[in-house]
Amino acid sequence: MMHNGSARKIKPAPPCSFVVFGASGDLTHRLLVPALYNLAAEGLLPEAFALIGVARTEMSNEAFREDLRKALHEFATRKVDEKVADRLLKCISYVDGAGDDEETYKKLGAELERVEKARGTEGNRLFYMATPPSAFRPIACALGRAGLAREENGAWRRLIVEKPFGTDLESARALNRDLLKVLNENQIYRIDHYLGKETVQNIMVLRFANGLFEPIWNRQHIDHVQITVAESLTVGRRGRFYDSTGALRDMVPNHLFQLLSLIAMEPPARFDARAVRSEKAEVLEAVQVLTEAEALRDSVRGQYTEGRIAEKPVEEYRKTKDVRPDSTIETYAALKLTIDNWRWAGVPFFLRTGKALESRRTEVAIKFKQAPFAMFRETPIERLAQNFLVLGVQPEEHISLQFNAKIPGPSIAIGGVDMTFRYEDYFDDAPSTGYETLIYDCMIGDAILFQRADGVEAGWRIVQPFLDAWKEKGGDGLAFYKAGSSGPAEAENLIKNNGRAWRTLVNGE
């Protein structure tokens, strides 16, 4: 969210109706409603606002409002002010029906007409698909047939699509084609909630608003980059979804590639959606697309076995409900990628993500090259602390720089130290869900933090050889790791064979 002092200077979003498909689901309760409450509390929701929930469950408006009130109290990131909550809940109504039933859209159209007159939302509509990916295409097509997404009389119509956007390159292209039959590209907002996190948004500010980093942000000074998205959570109740998806599809083309593109992109000519998204897409186009043999060489896929996390026993992945007992789906993926351009030639990017690991940690770690000469004879270069710039996303949002300094005393003894910036030390913002900025930006028509079709397809193009190679290998080559560990040993070997080492997950060293 915005700093409290600056939020007051930001205008509320324009009048609009916010339609959520899948309104009875987990995403709406845990993230969307708390995010809308936070926007309302900061005065960033318009007075002329309406929220319409759409789901299969039969429910009255009153029952839906009460359901969301309970969710708000359970999942709010700040203390709930009942006056603000009441003001928000009064704007909410509900339409029951299936996403592929034409009757649903007749009822939705009638409800939109009603709230637009009653609330004065001026015909502006924001549709949010908080549904399984299989529903994206039917909902978009039904909106098109009903004419609900057609822009007219100066009013805007926008659609937010959750990840995963496709399951491979072919399906991503097909989904883009289908959406573009109904809406223009500038109406489609492909959301990645990682881009709502302050540290992620701060990457561009760190690079381009400070004169000290960009001159050394290149192959002459950077040895390698590590991007880690580690989760201590297991698959849990998502067995059916996960066993048809896996860690690679679930995390890499979206979360990890968004981080990679922000780290590796060239400076945009302007800070606007077109320029920023063009540079992000261009750097993904420059990532070397591997052959299947190269993909096997430069990757590791793993699956967790039984173990312990936080002193609690964890059963193996294959015993999870709705998971096949002989499943070869990966719960861990590690890749080595390279970027074929002037800035990054020869600099490896190591990516890893996994479930049921020893610690929850998301970070980008940029390793700078060692000093070229051992001037301090009693401290060989190999004993000097490594110079890392670490951008921590979760569990704590921070930026730290690790470097060498003299240890106090009469001799020249050298030790590693770090300088750390934590958001909570400088800004008084209440915690957020990460969705507030994204929802607000969509309402005002700012697409900088959203993916464009070419960027999505570029990501799948990079991932496709890994998907194809792993599918062909089946169970062969699948590594195993204990739940509560740092991942498979083969992942350690992947980076070790390239002369580097992963940072630890527990304390980030």
Residue ranges and their predicted role:
Residues M1-V161, F165-E509:
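Secretory/organelle targeting and membrane-embedding segments
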